[in-house]
Amino acid sequence: MKSLLTLMMVVALLPAVMATAPLPAFFKVGHRGTRGLMPENTIPAMIRAIEDGANTLEFDVHITKDGKVVVYHDASFDPAYTTKPDGSEIQPSERGNYIFYQMNYNDIRPFRIGEKPYSKFPQQQRMRTYAPLLSEMIDSVEAYNKMHHKAPVYYLLEIKSSEKTDGKEQPAPEEYVEKLMEVKQLKKLGHRLLIQSFDMRPLQVLHQKYPKVILGFLTGDKNVSLYQQLEGLGFLPKFYNPHFSLVTKELLDYCHSKGMKVVPWTVADIEDMKRLKAMGADGIITDYPDRFNKL
């Protein structure tokens, strides 16, 4: 009876313990999954990142015409690595015809990703895959980890938006945020879904309406200081994620003194990865998660 009561108490406490579980000591982030070796922002890229040692999956999302959340980097299909449903090329002049916010997901799904050679990443494995829904990607990753007895991963979601493309490439920040929160709550990810953006507006909406969501500010702007950016943002995010070339010991010390973590992007060179980790970075975003085992 005593052991049964103990078990019941442990089970009762589990949700609270899980909800407040600490973040990883070092974020090993697979950029767009494993962009260096697999078609980016696809389910195979996410699975490969986990196999290669990533504890966090980074990806980009957009909202479709019918209100779905799709995983893809640009606001429209990139002809460099995507082809039409029949396998024919997408001409650069046609990109305006394939803006996700102006397409239903059923019309997006048949486009083919990964079949053609991608000159930026010649090591990418060629295959035929597609742009998944965020919900489908999460389900696939969670099922893979459960099947292979792997630890749960974190999801680092980037909101792709800009004030100048509101209404054309994405909804207003308030609507965008609500679509993401629907998926987050449905999938019960809790603290494992982290959200970052270069656009301050959706971060401000999230901070105001969903203060428990862990947020990160992305930057690659060397002409605007950290202090100016934080003043514009209006609050201290949990993460300040700059381009790796902007990271200094002074920046790291300041961020840490304010309780912010720094996870720079996008680092390919192993020596740069070692240098940033030794300097005190809280993680690294890379196209090559397999290189984490050399740190």
Where in the sequence are the language-model features?
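Bacterial Sec-dependent N-terminal signal peptides
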Residues: M1-A25
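Phosphate-group recognition and catalysis centered on beta-loop-alpha active-site segments
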Residues: M18-L295
